[in-house]
Amino acid sequence: MNPYKLFAAYAAPSVLAFALSGVYAIVDGFFVGHSMGDAGLSAINIAYPVVSLMQSLGTGIGMGGSVLWAVRRGSAGSLAAGGYVRATLLLLLAASTAAAGGLFWLTGPILRLMGAEGEIFILGKEYLDVIVLGAAFQIFATGIVPIIRNNGGSLFALAVMMSGFLTNIVLDYLFVWVFQWGTAGAAAATVIGQLVTTLGAFFYLIYRRLPIMGSLSGFIPMARQIAKVAASPFGLTFSPMASLMLINRFSVTNGGEAAVACYACIAYALTIVQMLVQGVGDGSQPLMSRFYGEGKLALASQIQRIA
């Protein structure tokens, strides 16, 4: 068992997948910016923290559940660990319902809080209203992928993320450039792209017969454990948005939409770098969780050092 080959097999697809996620954030801004100018690009950038919040919820819950599932499976077998998969899916459903139901009524106040006014506010609200309605696809797409990786499906995880990414590009071109649907069209393209990823992820769960059906006994204790582990990946994924929100607000105040659009280009480049680093960590996590559960602490430590 060569740890370097194992690490490469898991980490390389993960890094590529997260690189795609970084470009995913750019696609809407690229098409909207070329079609609608600074106002459209600024609106997308100001609204992005809300998109990131939903994706961070999915990432946190998915990582939390998949880590515990991998550890439990390594120590007690697949049957005993199955409850964590079911608990994770149920928590993703709860988060999706809460996000769609709660954020839909708050898109306006949130945009005002982040400094959006005038045309930027109108375009940003059009974008967020559609994004929030599709919250379930954002959350499930990012939440199921860690489960797939922890089942040894790193390449499949890359494939489903790539399918959603390509769908988003094609639909952005149609909705924004051809049909001229503006920011609402860009949001619809993003939601449909995430829907494609979600459907592919569920296909994997069913095809590989993962324990998605069964007893929910012990759900509350498992949910608490998942929430504790989920706090860290959620915070790490969402924390860069704090600086983005502050910079956007001060940019609007001091430089207007041109300043926000300028910083959006910088933020996109930073996002790709951040995603590449996160890809290394997320790619190594399934191996560390598995070896820890199997009691192979030396191997787990070696994977950690390689990462």
Label the predicted regions:
Residues 1-14, 69-136, 178-231, 288-307:
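Short alpha-helical transmembrane segments in multi-pass integral membrane proteins
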Residues 5-66, 231-252:
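Signature of the first transmembrane helix
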Residues 23-42, 111-118, 174-181, 241-272, ...:
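Helix-terminus/linker motif at the lipid-water interface of multi-pass membrane proteins
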Residues 41-101, 138-157, 262-307:
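Small-residue-rich hydrophobic transmembrane alpha-helices
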Residues 62, 130-149, 157-168, 186-201, ...:
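Short runs within selected transmembrane alpha-helices of multi-pass transporters and secretion channels
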